[in-house]
Regions:
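Compositionally biased terminal segments of proteins
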Residues: 1-215
Length: 215
């Protein structure tokens, strides 16, 4: 897995060189890795089992002067791929790490993907505002990287777990692994910011997984 970590580090350097670090959050399993590697959560140990990295674009219209992340990625040896069906951009490291870009749906949210001022087209999904509204910075490999606060990370995974299909068990394991390290007051603040439907889904998850969340 150390090789995969090196590939992830290469991608972060692309973000840094392209001026994009402050405009994105690392989400998904690699956020868990950063919680541990950057020492953001004392005593926490993650388990990375994915070849993919998910990157949440905070605001598709920022910065005002558009950047070109794909051009920088190409210079670092990444393959830039455009999905013919979804029209989304994917970066592929020569050693296999795949990077996908996400964007929160707003309003009716009819578009499956949207362009961004970072030079990539991102897949649009609901409930990502739970993450984007709760960022925290970590210092890693000399770079300032944004991730969601762990409480928001866990809350969002609870809200969407029923939609995750085959990945729901893996996500439940990640939640259980993080839960002992969660600040319950901060978690309640995040919970109080959710919509009524999101709160119902979170509460339902907690009832169904009560034994896993016992502290």
């Amino acid at each position: 897995m150390s090789t995969r970590h090196d590939e992830f580090d290469d991608f972060l350097r692309v973000l840094d060189e392209a001026g994009c670090l402050s405009h994105v959050l690392i989400v998904g399993s690699w956020a868990e890795y950063l919680y541990e590697a950057a020492g953001a959560i004392a005593g926490y140990q993650c388990a990375i089992r994915t070849l993919d990295a998910d990157v949440l674009v905070r605001n598709r219209r920022r910065p005002a002067d558009a950047l070109s992340m794909p051009e920088v990625a190409k210079r670092h040896g990444f393959l830039v791929v455009r999905d013919r069906i979804t029209d989304t951009t994917k970066l592929v490291h020569p050693m296999g790490l795949e990077v996908e870009f996400l964007l929160g749906k707003v309003g009716a949210g009819l578009e499956p993907s949207m362009g961004t001022n970072l030079g990539v087209t991102a897949q649009t999904l609901r409930h990502l505002d739970i993450l984007s509204h709760n960022p925290m910075g970590v210092r890693y490999q000399g770079m300032d990287v944004l991730v969601p606060i762990p409480e928001a990370y866990v809350a969002q995974k609870m809200v969407v777990n029923h939609e995750r299909g085959a990945k729901s068990d893996k996500d439940a394991a990640a939640i259980a692994n993080l839960w002992p390290h969660i600040d319950l007051d901060a978690f309640e603040v995040v919970r109080s910011s959710l919509t009524r439907r999101e709160t119902a889904r979170l509460d339902d998850y907690m009832r169904c997984h009560d034994s896993e969340l016992a502290t």
